[in-house]
Design a protein with these regions (language model features):
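Short linear motifs at secondary-structure transitions and domain/linker junctions
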Residues: 66-69, 75-83, 184-197, 304
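Extended alpha-helical interaction modules
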Residues: 91-274
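Structured inter-helical modules in multipass membrane proteins
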Residues: 235, 244-254, 261, 270-340
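Short linear functional motifs in flexible/disordered or boundary regions
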Residues: 2, 24-33, 259, 303, ...
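N-terminal pre-transmembrane cytosolic regions of membrane proteins
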Residues: 1-166, 439-441
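Hydrophobic alpha-helical transmembrane segments and their immediately adjacent juxtamembrane loops
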Residues: 331-441
């Protein structure tokens, strides 16, 4: 007899609890506007939402590497003192459009829910050894072994401060246990002063639950594809927070470079200053592009994945990450920086224009002086060098009584040129005064 197909996927059934620590790294792929790697649907079950993820594969996280880790090779600083058993571990590397490479360190732990707290602490603060190597070095080695090109200027891959932890359980947990996991502290709480949020769409069924905190989220008795979608949302948001941190640091660095250019104008030549301003301008344009496509686009998932539970969790995590406020702050920083950069470029243009005016003045004075001296002398020498009836070979060229008509003609030409210059100068001043409104026409 054929069993009927259920109208929806069942909730996940695991005998262990899963911790997935999502960490932004300092590594970036060469093409920032195009995510490298393979579609996540090849590794993660996305259920009925898979077509939407495939359609938007270039705008969502892609898998660079997926590496299973021997559970016996793991050493936890705090977790070693518990009776828990680490059953399975895996390292994921994701690439996100216009964002850094994101590492996801997942471990399956068989224990009571509260015993997860030491493991959460170890994973969050990188107090984990993998095959006698720190987690950071293991991530760098895995990325080096992946078939992907990263930006060489970044140097050795390191784990950044932007991270979020996901806890997946196969059964719902008491609210008090949830708060202990979210705050990573086995202490009592006062619910009135708690900031933990419970997404409505993920808690609408009495048999399932979810809680979102600033750094830890808990999903209980959810369907497997919902868990995977939530993990991909966390990857995208952590990448966005890592990118906006980089943009903020780059904006501050650009401001210091502009200030140094403004303070010490003699350290660099004009060409070097202009080249530096162009480099800063190009850097800021690239940062604005990455802010739009790497951060702002991550704030909304519903237009790509039309699913209430996925969208609800994504928005809740966006709110806790403070991504919208950070976007506004960094956008204002870039706008002010553009104003400062524009003022510095205008100042440089003014200096260059003044230099051009002085250069033209020097050339004009030199050419004018040569003209005043050379033209009359040329006329005089041309007159005496010709075979004219007025030229007497027996007389000196300085004989004023004999040659005064020629000398007077040359002097008259010089004075006429001077008069024309004074007239044009007076006319120019009058026109400028009329434009400025200081001369009555």
């Amino acid at each position: 007899m054929t069993l009927p197909v259920p109208p929806f996927d069942p909730t996940v059934e695991r005998s262990v609890h899963r911790i997935s620590t999502v960490i932004a790294t300092t590594a970036e792929t060469v093409d920032l506007l195009r995510a490298e790697g393979r579609p996540p649907s090849e590794f993660l079950r996305l259920g009925r939402l898979e077509p939407f993820y495939i359609a938007a594969v270039q705008q969502l996280p892609r898998v660079l590497a997926c590496r299973d880790i021997d559970a016996d090779s793991l050493k936890f600083r705090r977790g070693e003192s518990t009776t828990a058993t680490v059953c399975k571990a895996r390292l994921w590397l994701f690439d996100v459009q216009a964002g850094p490479v994101v590492a996801v360190f997942s471990v399956d732990v068989e224990c009571a829910p509260k015993v997860l707290i030491p493991f959460l602490e170890d994973c969050y603060y990188d107090h984990v050894m993998v095959e006698s190597s720190p987690l950071e070095r293991y991530v760098a080695e895995t990325l080096d072994g992946a078939d992907v090109q990263v930006v060489a200027s970044v140097g050795v891959t390191a784990l950044g401060p932007q991270r979020h932890q996901m806890v997946f359980t196969s059964a719902t947990l008491p609210e008090d246990t949830v708060q202990r996991i979210v705050y990573r502290a086995d202490l009592d709480w006062n619910p009135v002063y708690s900031s933990i949020q419970f997404p409505a769409e993920l808690n609408r069924r009495p048999s399932s639950g979810a809680a979102v905190g600033a750094y830890v989220s808990v999903l209980s008795a959810q369907q497997d594809y919902i868990e995977n979608c939530a993990l991909l949302s966390a990857v995208q948001i952590v990448a966005a927070t890592g990118k906006i941190r980089q943009i903020r640091l780059a904006a501050y660095d650009a401001l210091l470079r502009i200030r140094d250019l403004s303070r010490d104008r003699t350290a660099l030549s004009t060409a070097e200053r202009r080249a530096e301003l162009v480099r800063i301008n190009e850097t800021m344009a690239e940062q604005e592009l990455q802010l739009t496509f790497g951060v702002e686009t991550a704030c909304e998932i519903g237009i790509l994945i039309p699913a209430l539970r996925v969208e609800n969790f994504h928005r809740q995590l966006i709110e806790y990450a403070g991504l919208t406020d950070n976007v506004s702050t960094v956008s204002a920083m870039l706008a002010r920086l553009a104003s400062v950069l524009g003022a510095e470029q205008a100042s440089q243009d003014s200096i260059d224009a003044r230099k051009q005016d002085l250069r033209r003045l020097r050339y004009g004075v030199a050419v004018g002086f040569l003209s005043v001296v050379a033209v009359p002398i040329g006329i005089i020498l041309g007159f005496f060098g010709g075979s004219y009836r007025e030229v007497d070979a027996e007389r000196s060229i300085f004989d004023w009584r004999h040659y005064y008509p020629m000398y007077l003609s040359v002097l008259g030409l010089v004075f006429f040129a001077g008069a024309v210059f004074l007239f044009l100068f007076w006319r120019e001043r009058r026109e400028l005064g009329r434009v400025a409104g200081t001369v009555t026409p």
